[in-house]
Amino acid sequence: MAQIVSREIDTVAAVIDSSDSQGIARTAQARFERRRIRYFPLILGSASGACDERVGRFCSWYDEGDWYPRPELVQAEELREELLVLLDSIQALLPGDGWLLGQRVWYLSEARRWEEALEVARSCGTAEPWWCAALEGFSLHGLQRYVEADQAFSIAIDRMDNEQSLRWRVPRWVIDDDGKNALKKVETSSESLDNLLEHLWMLADPLYLVEGNDRKTSHYARWTVAKIRKEAKNPYRISWGNDLDELTIRHGWELGWDRTSDVGFTTVEHVIGHKHPEGRDYMPPGKALTTPSLATPEDLRADVERPRSLYAPAYAPVLLPMEGQVALFPRGSRVVVVGTHFLPEDTTRHVGHNHPIPWLDPGTQDGMLDRAGIFLVPLDGARIKSAQRIGHTEGALSIEVPSGSYVLSTETWSPSKRRAGRLRMGFESRPVPEDVASLSDILMLRPSSEEPELLEAALPQALKQAEILTGQTFAIAWEVSGLGFRSETLLFEVSVSQINRGVLRQIGEFLRITKPTRPLRLSWEEPGPPNPSPLFRYLNLDLPNLKAGKYEVRLVLKTVGRADAVSARVFSVQER
């Protein structure tokens, strides 16, 4: 994302008393921001054009084409270092000056000197306690120490006045209208607001595999940056206003800059600020806040065309949708949840470009092992349940939990590639009386000559997603619970039929020009289990004539005296 001032606006010149120490610091800061512009990359042509969105004085657009952050010129680095030396010396004279403290932390962060920024934040002297904690949280977020950052920001929030605390806590700018309405309804109730915000940040957390909640700490880090820059000069050459507050809170601070010039290259026409090229919207839609258990994978997909907010996790800027399999296996008052995982292929814009991709450089994550996990967040406030594995990015994991309402997240992460995949959704599982037959979801597997006898033994064969190639044999597995309390005969029916047939095909069938495609069917009878226990079944399916398209495999269980139980799985067939 990029943003630019949509028109030239006069700024108010500050009257500085050069004999005043802070005045000297403010003059130096303004001079640095003015001088650094000459070292921004110069681009040809006008920056004016169609805006994806206008916010106050700013024109913003989301498709930046081939832009990527270039290394800063040495001259700009030297100017910043000169400024930092001056600010350090003046801070020694004014140890409790919060403005100086903020500028020092900010410019150290710009130079990627996060450890030094943290050191400065922790030696804040007599500055306001809440501001010291906020600067510490900002620095810890930059160091990817998200648990500690959250703790520091919590202290800052507690020490603020109520009005500022509410402004920082309630993320009005980054959520949709449904979310705003939901928050508005609970603002007068502290407990209800806390619960709703807890759900919001739980859903917004990019990866549960990574300790802490970096989307939450990034929100408070952005407020900290807005506070730092509000009382200082900036490269846009305009005064800070609500529009810059909003753009910073929604999309973060700039990672790079460009400038345009007039035809004669004599004056700067515009300064363009660029946000992270891989920013995605991790904030959940409002409808998912009140009933997270009903959220669909599409609701919680971190990738939208016109986002309300943008964020790119430092540990995995490329976080892609992962369309794995999810299957529920009810067992009375409990349920086994199975999720498959794999590392999605990087299909982002820059992957094939012949230029450095700095955000994918392994850096400190080089040598870290790949990992995957399945996470279940109970919505009754109980502790998160998880199963994780290290050293792999493809496979299947399962976890057994009490029936209830949950948010499920299956995740995989390659630290060295700084890439991750995620499927997140809500679900509800109700307890089933022990003598009521309950049919599980269908799980698609690779075929095997040795049929597994238990679900746990079948998991290594699970297909990473519900997809096969033309001519490929596959297998399905399922489970029935609630049997064995009486003698009975089970009738299973399995069918495979094509769905979403083309319009011409449907017209041809209606006019009887072409014959309708008949579902492939298979049925058999077998006795129920002699004792109460889950009944696991496995079936190889060899369907060489399936053409490319979408299909549904449907399973029906019929027993005398019981209602039919039905389960289905949609899958796709791709050309080889």
Model-derived regions, located:
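A cross-family detector of function-defining hotspots
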Residues: 185-242, 246-313
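Structural register within alpha-helical repeat arrays
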Residues: 69-70, 103-104, 135-136, 170, ...
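Generic helix N-cap/helix-start motif at coil->alpha-helix transitions
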Residues: 60-65, 83, 93-101, 127-134, ...
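Helix-turn-helix repeat elements of alpha-solenoid scaffolds
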Residues: 5, 33-43, 71-85, 106-119
